[in-house]
Amino acid sequence: MTTLNLSNDALAAAAVNQVLADLVTSISGRGGVKCITTLNGTNAAPTGTGITNKATLVTAGWTVTTN
């Protein structure tokens, strides 16, 4: 997977946070492959650890777009 587009799915903050957490967990198994992840549109913005997880993904070279 190189692109994950979940924009405009009306996800609550808890769901956005969970997606980001799951993606952080998957980093070690991806062998350095980067992913473009889109979670904006009608989705809630990440909160708390979701913000931290987004930063972790960006630091790993991913492109992550959220509200």
Please provide the spans of the model-predicted regions.
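Solvent-exposed loop and capping/linker segments of extracellular ligand-binding repeat ectodomains
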Residues: 1-67
